[in-house]
């Protein structure tokens, strides 16, 4: 919490006035990230090309620039803390479910629009896409020198190609 207080230009005591525990601070930060990503998704300028639109949407969830890297760092810290902290566990499950439902919607839309490979299992593919994005976030945050933004994008595009049987 000390480093957050320093970066915010506040005393540790002032920060603790608002957030008694580090978990409260992380939950608040995660809520802000969730709101930012939701706003960014709503403001996306869709192209009319379903494939490009899917790429644009999924790209909002991985660390491709400084803003998304910072959001990814918050997500990773929050999820790591939620594993052992029951006070924020319910919120972490809500965040997880919200992401999964988004991926399920993407994959379902691909099937409805005839973009998906013929024998695609919608629920399994949504879980696979969710796991891929989570993994790209973890590696993009913890080892950015080994998995650059360009490589993250390449992995996503390759995976979408497989889903679309291209």
Model-derived features: positions:
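Helix-turn-helix
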Residues: 1-24, 28
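Hydrophobic/aromatic-rich alpha-helical bundle segments in the mid-to-C-terminal region
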Residues: 87-93, 97, 111-163
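A conserved beta-strand->loop->alpha-helix hinge within the catalytic CA
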Residues: 3, 49-53, 121
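Amphipathic alpha-helical segments used for helix-helix packing
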Residues: 53, 66-90
